[in-house]
Amino acid sequence: MLHLYNSLTRKKEPFVSLRPGKIGMYVCGITVYDHCHLGHARSMVAFDVMVRYLRSQGFDVTYVRNITDIDDKIIARASERDVSIDELTAQYIDAMNNDTHALNILPPDHEPRATGHIETIIRLIQRLLEKGNAYVSENGDVCYEVDTFPEYGKLSHKDIEGLVSGSRVEIVKEKRSPLDFVLWKKAKPGEPSWPSPWGEGRPGWHIECSAMAMHELGEQFDIHGGGLDLQFPHHENEIAQSEAATGKPFANYWLHVGMLQVNGEKMAKSIGNFYTIADVLKEHHPEVIRYFLLSSHYRSPLNYSEENLLNAKKALIRLYQAVKDVPPQTADSKLDEYWQEQFNQAMNDDFNTPVALSVLFQLAHEVNKSNSPALAHTLKNLAGILGFLQKDPESFLQSGLAEEEKLVIEQLIAERLKARAERNWTKADQIRADLLSKGIELEDGATGTTWRRIAE
């Protein structure tokens, strides 16, 4: 049975969906004012794997990942570049789609944008005003009054006073309490705005997600996810405003992905220590990046380094070597139940991908020993749930080399073939040994000599 670590209760719990066989999942997406960095990729890959696994277990998953396309940062960046907000957001939405496609991240079933749900947001704010959980401040903003929600802090597990310091709280002097947060911002000159019962303005960040989640999944759903940095105040505020409006629990399970770090610090644009997905893709195969991101449990911090990416590449090479000579899978190919069960046990333990990867390596060892097509197909199928081992093995094993390097290898193979034809076995063996020392393995066959990279 699947067990998930629920941030709300701080413990692993058996997963029971609200509707048998169906799962509603909402994950906070990006704010589109810049290129996605590898920290964004970690969160997207983590939830992508969760969705893939849940579907492999027969669940009908409705996966929603939003786009924040109106925000202070977006407005500021558009102004800096002297472009329209629509032009700016379109640019970075396209870039995000290119990144996710390259990383084999499945598109969500629904990808709502904040600007497409203004009426939904306004209706939710009206409910909060009617219930006495919100107020119109002196400057025309509509704010949520935290003191009206006694359970505030139940997600971050901190007392109210402790939450005030060191948080992403927007300081507005018209607030009744420092923790009160803006639901609707009064329009400012030159900024985009929409009509509302409280005058022209635009939605605050937190209310957008509550409104879009409830629009797509209903007032209650199963899983809400995002990066650990969103736990407070964003997710805490989502709970407060959603549950105050409906009187029901918002999401049953809260899952948070640990931070990607560089030298012990969170990778972030605000710090300037980030690597964009596009830049990392220039240097590393997409499946290598996926493997690296899954090498640590999703809740644990993960350190970015070239050494860790190199280790991921070596690991994938070993897996691809195990399946390189496997005949194509047929419709009646059956998967090995024992290894399926071992893999499922790992994933049922709060999506424990490091243990799942160790299962794949044990299975690869058995494939190498037995050369069993059934085991090899099982390996490819299970790895596919993690989103890799889906390329042509020969193509992958030759990837990552410059054309000049490939040309040198082909020239050496030609020299070796000539030496063999001349029965100069010493020279032929020396060329093979030299290439092997550089991580290139030759294989002689009826149609000629082929080569591939191997794990060094």
From Swiss-Prot:
ATP binds at residue 269. SMART domains: DALR_2. GO terms for cellular component: cytosol. Monomer. One of its GO terms (molecular function) is cysteine-tRNA ligase activity. It catalyses: tRNA(Cys) + L-cysteine + ATP = L-cysteinyl-tRNA(Cys) + AMP + diphosphate. Belongs to the class-I aminoacyl-tRNA synthetase family. A motif ('KMSKS' region) lies at residues 266-270. Disulfide bonds: none annotated. It is found in: Cytoplasm. The lineage of its organism: Bacteria, Pseudomonadati, Pseudomonadota, Gammaproteobacteria, Legionellales. Gene3D superfamilies: Cysteine-tRNA ligase, C-terminal anti-codon recognition domain (1.20.120.1910), HUPs (3.40.50.620). Its main location: cytoplasm. Its cofactor is Zn(2+). One of its GO terms (biological process) is cysteinyl-tRNA aminoacylation. Keywords: Aminoacyl-tRNA synthetase, ATP-binding, Cytoplasm, Ligase, Metal-binding, Nucleotide-binding, Protein biosynthesis, Zinc. This is Cysteine--tRNA ligase. A motif ('HIGH' region) lies at residues 30-40. The gene is cysS. CDD domains: Anticodon_Ia_Cys, CysRS_core.
